[in-house]
């Protein structure tokens, strides 16, 4: 068995043990693609997978606005209040961290395994919520940058 396939099997097992359906499903899908000789899909998934994931994430976030559960009045109040202002600042910082995390994963794709293991530990022991490796990579990039200040 190739190391990529073995890593996917390990991630599948980690996902099952940690009850992280997303990790288990992703590892399973990639194993199926590999074993069914449809590996021509890998470049497409690598190039467009993040965009597709963000598309579905944004769709789920915008549904309350589209269905009027969040009104224009709610939105205006939110952006003009202190919590709303802080959420805007949080969004700015988060997108910057995500950008740095994406750069880190492009420079060193092997870092994803550590991000997933860390996410699983966070889920199991700290009641964390997995939102994907991009934010975890952003935080890791921040830690690496801080460490570089001292070297």
Curated annotation (Swiss-Prot):
Provide the transmembrane region boundaries: 9-29, 47-67, 75-95, 111-131
The UniProt keywords, alphabetically, are:
Cell membrane, Membrane, Transmembrane, Transmembrane helix
Query: Might you report a single GO cellular component term?
Result: plasma membrane
Q: Which Pfam families match?
A: DUF441 (PF04284)
Q: How does it sit in the membrane?
A: Multi-pass membrane protein
Where in or outside the cell it occurs: the entry states: Cell membrane
| InterPro entries according to UniProt | UPF0756_TM
Superkingdom of origin organism: Bacteria
Provide the family line.
Answer: Belongs to the UPF0756 family.
Q: Which PANTHER family match?
A: UPF0756 MEMBRANE PROTEIN YEAL
Protein name (record): UPF0756 membrane protein Dred_1676
Q: Which organism is it from?
A: Desulforamulus reducens (strain ATCC BAA-1160 / DSM 100696 / MI-1) (Desulfotomaculum reducens)
């Amino acid at each position: 068995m190739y190391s990529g396939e073995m890593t996917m099997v390990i991630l599948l097992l980690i996902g099952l043990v940690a009850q992280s359906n997303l990790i288990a499903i992703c590892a399973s899908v990639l194993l199926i693609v590999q074993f069914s000789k449809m590996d021509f899909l890998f470049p497409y998934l690598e190039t467009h997978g993040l965009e597709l994931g963000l598309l579905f994430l944004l769709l789920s976030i915008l549904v309350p606005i589209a269905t009027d559960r969040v009104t224009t009045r709610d939105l205006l109040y939110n952006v003009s209040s202190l919590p709303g202002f802080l959420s805007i600042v949080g969004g700015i910082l988060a997108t910057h961290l995500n950008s740095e995390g994406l750069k880190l994963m492009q420079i060193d794709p092997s870092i994803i395994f550590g991000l997933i293991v860390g996410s699983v530990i966070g889920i199991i022991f700290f009641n964390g919520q997995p939102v994907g490796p991009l934010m975890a990579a952003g935080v890791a990039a921040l830690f690496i940058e801080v460490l570089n200040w001292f070297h």
